């Protein structure tokens, strides 16, 4: 799915117009059809509680699906979730991994998260993670 996908544009327009439930319904349908960008947006809906109840564990579930398909914003979201223990157990090593993937994809917020997370890791952990890259 591309950013110019008509269904995705319809979901974005619904957000802009304040119709959060419609946006949630559209991205839910597309996400369940394994559309990566919609999976990221569905994670965002759950994370923010927009058009649905706030649920960080569901946000992580959908971000993980999108991240595995290369959506860097979802990778950054996972880094944030692991760094802060939101929807998953706090894990700075896993946060670093996801921030690193997103930063490699050009996500600026992930670069900041990567630097902040690196400060929470031991030199041994950093060396090990750098060898993974």
Write out the residue ranges for each language-model feature:
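TPR/TPR-like alpha-solenoid signature
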Residues: 8, 40, 61, 76, ...
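TPR-adjacent "capping" and linker segments in tetratricopeptide-repeat scaffold/adaptor proteins
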Residues: 1-6, 29, 124
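Short helix-capping/linker turns of helical repeat alpha-solenoids
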Residues: 2-3, 18-19, 32-35, 48-50, ...
């Amino acid at each position: 799915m591309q950013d110019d996908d008509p269904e995705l544009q319809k979901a974005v327009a619904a957000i802009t117009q304040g119709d959060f439930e419609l946006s949630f319904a559209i991205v839910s349908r597309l996400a369940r059809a394994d559309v990566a960008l919609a999976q990221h947006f569905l994670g965002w809906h759950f994370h923010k509680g927009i058009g649905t109840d706030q649920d960080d564990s569901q946000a992580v579930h959908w971000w993980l699906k999108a991240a595995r398909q290369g959506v860097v914003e979802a990778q950054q979201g996972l880094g944030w979730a692991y760094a802060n223990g939101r929807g998953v157990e706090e894990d700075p090593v896993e946060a670093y991994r996801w921030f690193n993937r997103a930063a490699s994809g050009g996500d600026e917020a992930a670069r900041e998260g990567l630097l902040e997370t690196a400060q929470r890791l031991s030199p041994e952990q950093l060396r090990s993670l750098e060898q993974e890259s």
